[in-house]
Structures are given as C-alpha cells and as structure tokens.
Amino acid sequence: MKLKEKLDRLINQKKTLLGVGPMSKNVVDSTIEIANKFNTPLMFIASRRQIDSSDFGGGYVNNWDTASYSKYVKKRDKKNNLILCRDHGGPWQNNLELKKKLNLVQAMKSAKQSYLEDIKNNFEIIHIDASLNLRNNNKINDALERTYELYEYCYEQAHKFKKKILIEVGTEEQTGSTNTFEEIEFFLENLVKFCN
C-alpha cells in the first residue's frame, strides 16, 4: 500500500495517525505486532540519534543503522502498515556532528548523507530541521537557506531513486522557547514561495 493510500484510508476512517519513537527493540517489536494484529498504519519516527547511517555509527537503538533498521521493520511488517519517518534530520542533529563541532559545510554534507540513506531505505516522511546552529546566532534567514538546500536535495534524491516522500519542516530550535508569530509567518511564507 502506498503512503498516500495509507493516509487517505486513515482520513476516510476519521482516525488519527499515531507516531511511535523507536526507543528500543522492544518498542519496535511491539509496534510491529500491533500494526499487524489490528491492520492499522503506524509511523516510526526516528531521530538521527536513535537511528542513523552506518557512516555515522548508526544510532543508540539496538545498534541499528538506517539500512538494518529498515530491513528489520519491513521484513516483519506483514501488512505493509508501517511508515518509516525521520524526525529532526538536518545539520548538527547527530551526536557525532556535535562532538566534532562540524562547520556548516561539513554539517550540511553530513545531513545530506543521512537523508540519502533514509530515502534509499524507504523512509517516507522526512523532517528537515535546519534550526540548530552551533554559534547560537541562529537567524531565521540562515535557517531558511539551509532548509531550501536540504529540501531541494531530498526532492532530487527521491526523484533519482524513484521514491515517494513527504517533507515536514521544522521552524525553530527545540530549546523551550518559541518563535514569534511574525517569525513563523515569515518562515512559512518564504518556504511556500520556494516550493512554488
């Protein structure tokens, strides 16, 4: 079943789509069992710290890298109900990038490599979160430029590998504070212009 069909089915059933963080192998196995038993779509939403490319040492969940995690889930997903999703992908969203204090060019290259692995390994929803900045001088225009670059890259790679993806975009760093209404409006208006 294709992603659009899964989502359409949920909309028509008037049910919400549950996203589960793959915090452990037990959580992954339980979620797969529930999706199979009740024939219902569920999303696995993995951060780069939980699951990432083998190029970055994988993630803390069961020592899985992107490819082995995807294979594990897809092999057990008897009714094709599980949707693999990337949560908070982007520069400096992996512990290795933070530890090495990668500069912007290096962090963007790393993020692109991670997204490429996601796309090749059947992740269907990609969260682009370009809000982090190691210098703590994150300007909304800088985040927009990084978002544009990553959005275009993901779109091109999905097209190249004949994969269908949906893209979610983050607008602010997760620090407990929030952007102003005007900042969010500015970000979204500019993102819509870019996408058109």
Question: Which sequence ranges carry the predicted segments?
Answer:
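Alpha/beta catalytic barrel-like cores
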Residues: 1-86, 93-94, 100-109, 113-116, ...
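Helix-rich catalytic cores of soluble enzyme domains
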Residues: 90, 94-196
